[in-house]
C-alpha cells in the first residue's frame, strides 16, 4: 500500500510539474510580425521615430504563473533605421550606438510581475557597453492557434531609457534626454 501511495504521489508531482512549465516562443521576425521601435523628441517640436531591423529572441509565457516567464532579445545595433541615411550613419558612430565596438544590444529579463492586465518585465539592457535595469510595461494582445497548425502569442510593450545611463552624452537638448521604446512581438510556440 505504501509503495502504491508513494508511486501515485511521485507520478502526480511529475505530471503537475510538467504541465506547469511555461511554453517557449521564438519571435517571428521572418513573417515580419515583430518590431523594435523607438522615438525621441526633436527640439521639442516633433517626434523622431526609428526602428531596429535586425533582432532575434525568445520568450516563455505561462499565463497562470507569469513570474516564471523569461525574455531574451539580441539586437543588431547596426540595423538602426530612422529613414534618413546620414542620421543613421551618425547614430551608428561612437557618439551614439558605437556599433563598431558594440555591435549588439541585449535584453535579458530578471523578473516578470502581473499588474492588473499588464506585465511589468524587468531586465538587464546592455547597450553601448553598459548594462542597466529597465522595466517594460507589456500587454498580451492575444494567443492561440495559427492557420498552419502552430500556436502563437503576441505582446506589445513600452518603456523609457535615459541616454546618459548608457554613456550616450551627445547634447540633444533638454527635451531629448529619454528615448521611448515601442515594441510589438508575435512569437511562434516551439515544440
Curated annotation (Swiss-Prot):
Localization of this protein: Periplasm
Gene3D superfamilies, alphabetized: Lipid/polyisoprenoid-binding, YceI-like
Record Pfam families: YceI
Alphabetic keyword roster: Periplasm, Signal
Signal peptide: 1-22
InterPro entries: Lipid/polyisoprenoid-bd_YceI (IPR007372), TTHA0802/YceI-like_sf (IPR036761), UPF0312/YceI (IPR023480)
Keyword Flavoprotein: no
GO cellular component: periplasmic space
Protein family: Belongs to the UPF0312 family. Type 1 subfamily.
Protein name: Protein YceI
The species this protein was found in: Salmonella newport (strain SL254)
Amino acid at each position: 500500500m505504501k509503495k502504491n501511495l508513494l508511486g501515485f504521489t511521485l507520478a502526480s508531482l511529475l505530471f503537475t510539474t510538467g504541465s506547469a512549465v511555461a511554453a517557449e516562443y521564438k519571435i517571428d521576425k521572418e513573417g515580419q510580425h515583430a518590431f523594435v521601435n523607438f522615438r525621441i523628441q526633436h527640439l521639442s517640436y516633433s517626434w523622431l521615430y526609428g526602428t531596429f531591423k535586425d533582432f532575434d529572441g525568445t520568450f516563455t509565457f505561462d499565463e497562470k504563473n507569469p513570474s516564471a516567464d523569461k525574455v531574451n532579445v539580441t539586437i543588431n545595433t547596426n540595423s538602426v533605421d530612422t529613414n534618413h541615411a546620414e542620421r543613421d550613419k551618425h547614430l551608428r558612430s561612437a557618439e551614439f550606438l558605437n556599433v563598431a565596438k558594440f555591435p549588439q544590444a541585449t535584453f535579458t529579463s530578471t523578473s516578470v510581475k502581473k499588474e492588473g492586465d499588464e506585465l511589468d518585465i524587468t531586465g538587464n539592457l546592455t547597450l553601448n557597453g553598459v548594462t542597466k535595469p529597465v522595466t517594460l510595461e507589456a500587454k498580451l494582445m492575444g494567443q492561440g492557434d495559427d492557420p498552419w497548425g502552430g500556436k502563437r502569442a503576441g505582446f506589445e510593450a513600452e518603456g523609457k531609457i535615459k541616454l546618459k545611463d548608457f554613456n550616450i552624452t551627445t547634447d540633444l537638448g533638454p527635451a531629448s534626454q529619454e528615448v521611448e521604446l515601442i515594441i510589438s512581438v508575435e512569437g511562434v510556440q516551439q515544440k
